[in-house]
């Protein structure tokens, strides 16, 4: 999703000692696959995940917005004025609209925690949501590190 690339580029360019990873993986669902196998197939490596339960769209949007708006402190993060800028707000609206679109197509949204095999290196924040839609799975994942 272009909105993920755009906001990650903005945060990575304007942050210090701070790297943002955002990705959306999509693939066919398998009725017989366990959660670890299904998510592992999406990210392309073995993973161990914790299922934190089903969530509603509002919870998804609140968590993603909170994570992406992380300011940090001296030495890491993004300057507060950048997170308050019109450019950031516009980029965040794009991500929120894309997340709403994913949620509208999903029969379920599950919050996950990737315990092993995370495709990035989470330090400051992380999120992972698995959307089940018809015959496919969509994993919306984000994290930040130093």
Placement of each model-derived feature along the sequence:
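N-terminal "domain-start" segment
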Residues: 1-86
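Acidic, proline/glycine-rich low-complexity IDRs
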Residues: 94-146
């Amino acid at each position: 999703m272009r909105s993920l690339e755009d906001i990650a580029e903005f945060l990575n360019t304007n942050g210090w000692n701070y790297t943002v990873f955002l990705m959306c993986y999509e693939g066919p669902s398998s009725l017989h696959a366990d959660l670890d196998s299904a998510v592992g197939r999406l990210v392309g490596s073995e993973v161990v995940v914790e299922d934190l339960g089903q969530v509603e769209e509002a919870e998804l949007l609140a968590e993603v917005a909170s994570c992406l708006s992380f300011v940090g402190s001296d030495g890491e993060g993004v300057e507060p004025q950048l997170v308050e800028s019109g450019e950031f707000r516009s980029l965040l609206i794009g991500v929120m609209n894309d997340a709403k679109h994913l949620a509208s197509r999903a029969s379920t949204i599950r919050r996950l925690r990737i315990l092993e095999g995370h495709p990035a290196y989470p330090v400051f924040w992380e999120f992972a949501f698995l959307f089940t839609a018809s015959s496919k799975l969509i994993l919306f994942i984000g994290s930040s590190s130093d």
